[in-house]
């Protein structure tokens, strides 16, 4: 497939902020994509080379890309850097420079999607002393044969600066429309994606075999399953109103959610966001096979840091010391853990997703041979509100965050929320001491001591029905100087020249970001807002909801994706459950 076809579609997609138009352009591209290339196309438009859990990254710095453009164009690197500073986009700058190129390559090799993709994969695999020079030569070889427009999008793919605003849901809409005749079939594709976590594989299947091929997807060891998520409740009475008596209450631990895959003594571990984190937990890899009565299994657990002397649980942040490339053995010794299992998704050839929580829990307890390192999360059956209050108090006294509440008869719904699981934490019982996990979508430049940094951040919830990020507040308090420096470093690579199509905001930020970074925020209350877009029209026509006096807690939710952020439905529920409903005119912006 000619790369120019992909580049043309990318150019069209970059020029629109309308989701329906984006989906239509993508659908047209997928229809004309040969089956053998469609997985590559799906990965590339998402800015990836392979699914997230394989951890393949290009590792190309801007300076290296500038050297490659210089080599291909014959122009000094300083001139290219000046054009880059002017345009703010190396792809655009390179396109302009290559249009002025006087030399002609008579024996140019054809630029196809396959060639570009294979070259990028070779670049990603390069390591060692000469790897940077080899990467530069590979990039230059593509640019030598590329048209200016092709070169622009090759560089955007290499540097990860392709800003299309296309999420998995948009890709699945386009795939369903292109190969099954209707977007209404997206749930079938979504189920396949939820058990495989590989949208490229789903695209290959539906493009060649339609819905029948997609229905053949099944749970497989070492292919992570997208985790089931919980809604929140603020009180014991609300939980019982939603679930009824007889619900199961598990302790909610403050650790890292880990999906454990076991086969024949081999263990791999995946995070909540599907990152392969096996290297950070060699103690789990070594010890868990001896604690599980299974040949093959996929289980979910919470890895929690502990004080070995007292046995007490330590905060989640302690686990971050394990996130290092070197001296991991020292970190394991210094920051010991326990592995606390709470669900089983697959066991010795049996897919457990469709069976009830009660059945899964019984299987789990039969599989885990408990000791001080590996155990099952404590659970109890709740007959009434008094018992739920006692269970919450017991969990907090045990050093936990609160409770996870689960319907006994409910299946495991991979990749979704839906009321089958609820979380009840101690702070949710306050007037609005509740914390919310919000996505950073924009920023306003600081003044005074904050000059040269982002002084205030624009935050959003996640609207899962529209797959958008509607704004909910600006936050400028709770930050230390160290926080501001860290956020500037974290957010600067995510700056976009125009607002991401998935962002819904009535404000104009000084800087827009791709919605990727999640932070924890507290506030005094939730108010109606004429400015912010969260839950727009849900409470009052023309009004959204906003946080009043929001404050950063100091906690970045690095384990969460943007789609894991607090939803507009959660905010509506919190607003309605306030003891007094705050009137209009208190926007809390």
Swiss-Prot record:
The active site is at 252 (n6-amp-lysine intermediate). InterPro entries: ATP-dep_DNA_ligase (IPR050191), DNA_ligae_ATP-dep_bac/arc (IPR022865), DNA_ligase_ATP-dep (IPR000977), DNA_ligase_ATP-dep_C (IPR012309), DNA_ligase_ATP-dep_cent (IPR012310), DNA_ligase_ATP-dep_CS (IPR016059), DNA_ligase_ATP-dep_N (IPR012308), DNA_ligase_N_sf (IPR036599). It catalyses: ATP + (deoxyribonucleotide)n-3'-hydroxyl + 5'-phospho-(deoxyribonucleotide)m = (deoxyribonucleotide)n+m + AMP + diphosphate. It holds the Pfam family DNA_ligase_A_M. Its EC number is 6.5.1.1. Its cofactor is Mg(2+). Transmembrane segments: none annotated. Keywords: ATP-binding, Cell cycle, Cell division, DNA damage, DNA recombination, DNA repair, DNA replication, Ligase, Magnesium, Metal-binding, Nucleotide-binding. GO terms for biological process: cell division; DNA biosynthetic process; DNA recombination; DNA repair; lagging strand elongation. This is DNA ligase. Belongs to the ATP-dependent DNA ligase family. ATP binds at residues 250, 257, 272, 302, 342, 417, 423. DNA ligase that seals nicks in double-stranded DNA during DNA replication, DNA recombination and DNA repair.
